[in-house]
Amino acid sequence: MTNTRGSNSATSASTTNSQGVLMVGPNFKVGKKIGCGNFGELRLGKNLYNNEHVAIKLEPMKSKAPQLHLEYRFYKLLGQAEGLPQVHYFGPCGKYNALVMELLGHSLEDLFDLCDRHFSLKTVAMVAMQLIRRIEYVHTKHLIYRDVKPENFLIGRYSTRKQHVLHIIDFGLAKEYIDCDTGKHIAYREHKSLTGTARYMSINTHLGKEQSRRDDLEALGHMFMYFLRGSLPWQGLKADTLKERYQKIGDTKRQTAVEVLCEGFPDEFAQYLRYARRLDFFETPDYDFCYNLFKSVLDRLGATYDYEFDWTPKLNNVSTPSGSLHTSESKDVKRTDRGELKVSQAAAHAQFGSTQVINSNAGEVVEESRNTEGRTAAGDNSSGEVKCCCFRRRRRKHNNATPATQK
């Protein structure tokens, strides 16, 4: 990892240079805003040493719930490994703390939209195999992730060697499950407030139980079924308050049998969810068993892990836009006719995370997706439009009454 901690000196800390350009550290130029959230904003940046674009996460120093420094510490703990974004710098930037990171490509949620909200068995199996290894690595560093959702898994930038690698980003909700002082597993507790994304979080999380490694795996299983079905049975539930909605989501998860959730799909998906839900709080998961479940799905399909995902031909068929940046750069970053940089929603998701909602029970963070509960369920947004303070895009309307037909 090439990250460095910025000092408080005038020479190394972020300043406005003689040309009036805002800088982070000695060589990172701060550009336009491409994303925002409750705890700060995301800026496009540029490394003036090599002209590569970066993502710069900014958090006010006076934030009431600072998390950027903790996220930076977790990235240092994780180090350099496949599927983790490279961190270049952490330090002050005026009234902000700044985290400078590798700019990645599209999120799985963006790619899901690109594929008309349907992934094939082959694609989901390959995604599952990568993400199980990714979560396994995080767990080996004594961290639990606690923020599984499609927006937090990104491919590398287009036309680079990382374009088929799924990266795990946004460790603002991660937690050490091994006590640093004692070297022992954290204690089992109940009556915890919700932390994570309601759509994907485990049943035990809804029940207020302390999270451990098992909960990351169960949340992955819910996300895999989301990709296969197109939606989950607990999406689009209405309630007067967020607390009541989370309660309804949890109740529906408990009432939906695994066999019903996974009906029409290979039994390995049901086996995986049953396994994750039966794990003990302290238990080390058998990651190889989980990985091989999805490898067997590929084997029965007569397929190999060839990195040919459903989105691959769709991205390959995207023509290079007029006036775009150098062809080796991501198609996320483009130039308008005026020469201004324009970044897609995928790039804005990268390394940033989503809007957070504080649960009134205890003040821990409940992670919501960018739009509503996890996301507005397909087909129940009457306007068909997704909005936030930075983006507006049109979405096709879909029916979510039945799972997508697997071909």
Curated annotation (Swiss-Prot):
Gene disruption phenotype: RNAi-mediated knockdown in 1-cell embryos results in mislocalization of the pronuclei and the spindle towards the anterior part of the embryo, spindle instability, and failure of asymmetric cell division in 50 percent of embryos. In addition, spindle pulling forces are increased. par-2 and par-3 mediated embryo polarity is normal. Oocytes have increased cortical grp-1 and grp-2 localization. Large polar bodies formation during female meiosis.
Function statement: Involved in the asymmetric cell division of the embryo downstream of par-2 and par-3 by regulating the asymmetric cortical distribution of pkk-1, a phosphatidylinositol 4,5-bisphosphate-producing enzyme, which in turn regulates the asymmetrical distribution of grp-1, grp-2 and lin-5. Prevents expulsion of the entire meiotic spindle into a polar body by negatively regulating the Rho GTPase signaling pathway. Involved in regulation of reactive oxygen species (ROS) levels.
Enzyme category, top tier: transferase
Amino-acid positions noted as binding ATP in the UniProt annotation, renumbered to this chain: I34, G35, C36, G37, N38, F39, G40, E41, L42, K57
Subunit structure: Interacts with doxa-1.
Region (Disordered): 319-339, 359-384
Protein kinase domain: residues covered: 28-298
Catalysed reaction equations from the record: L-seryl-[protein] + ATP = O-phospho-L-seryl-[protein] + ADP + H(+); L-threonyl-[protein] + ATP = O-phospho-L-threonyl-[protein] + ADP + H(+)
InterPro entries: CK1_Ser-Thr_kinase (IPR050235), Kinase-like_dom_sf (IPR011009), Prot_kinase_dom (IPR000719), Protein_kinase_ATP_BS (IPR017441), Ser/Thr_kinase_AS (IPR008271)
A single Gene Ontology CC term: nucleus
PROSITE patterns: PROTEIN_KINASE_ATP (PS00107), PROTEIN_KINASE_DOM (PS50011), PROTEIN_KINASE_ST (PS00108)
EC number: 2.7.11.1
Gene encoding the protein: csnk-1
Family (UniProt): Belongs to the protein kinase superfamily. CK1 Ser/Thr protein kinase family. Casein kinase I subfamily.
GO biological process, one term: endocytosis
Organism: Caenorhabditis elegans
Keyword terms: ATP-binding, Cell cycle, Cell division, Cytoplasm, Kinase, Meiosis, Nucleotide-binding, Serine/threonine-protein kinase, Transferase
Main location: cytoplasm
Protein name: Casein kinase I gamma
SMART domains in the cross-refs: S_TKc
Other facts: Shares partial functional conservation with human CSNK1G1, CSNK1G2 and CSNK1G3 in reverting increased survival in excess iodide.
